[in-house]
């Protein structure tokens, strides 16, 4: 399949959007014919747990809709990275890729504090409010796009291919090469 659909086990609110139990989520994750795991997502059993990783191929490979064969280097044009990350239990870990205009608006309780490196005490932002804001941002990303910049702005761009022929002076990462 070129779009692994996942059925929600329970009602959930992500950001400002409500998803009902039983809703089938379009992930855009590709699963090659005959494969036991999604493309670009190595699965292993370790320390008593199933662990799933992500490799470059999750974004930079796809399954051909007609032949059902893997096309390495082609972008996964419908991979829904924003929705997948918003559904994660701690999308705030990726807040540097969301639209964050500072943290003062998220400070709800001034008794929750941290001591800074210079010995001062500063209030901590509300983690649930930040999670909600990050999720709202990620839900706006169109499928086939990803934000790889760490600039506190939401500026996803289309997932590129990883072919380099004819791309000179740009490499697979998009940066100019000498």
What are these regions (language model features)?
Residues 1-178:
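Periplasmic c-type cytochrome electron-transfer domains
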């Amino acid at each position: 399949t070129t779009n692994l659909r996942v059925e929600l086990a329970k009602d959930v609110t992500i950001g400002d959007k409500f998803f009902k139990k039983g809703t089938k989520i379009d992930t855009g994750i590709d699963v090659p014919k005959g494969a036991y795991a999604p493309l670009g997502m190595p699965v292993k059993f370790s320390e008593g747990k199933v662990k799933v990783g992500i490799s470059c191929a999750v974004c930079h490979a796809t399954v051909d809709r007609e032949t059902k064969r893997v096309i390495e280097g082609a972008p996964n044009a419908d991979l829904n990275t924003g929705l997948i990350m918003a559904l994660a239990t701690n999308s705030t870990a990726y807040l540097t890729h969301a639209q964050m205009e500072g943290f003062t608006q998220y400070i709800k309780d001034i008794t929750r504090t941290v001591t800074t490196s210079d010995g001062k005490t500063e209030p901590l932002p509300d983690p649930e409010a930040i999670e909600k804001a990050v999720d709202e941002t990620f839900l706006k990303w169109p499928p086939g796009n990803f934000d790889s910049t760490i600039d506190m702005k939401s500026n996803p761009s289309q997932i590129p291919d990883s072919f380099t022929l004819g791309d000179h002076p740009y490499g697979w990462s998009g940066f100019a090469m000498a």
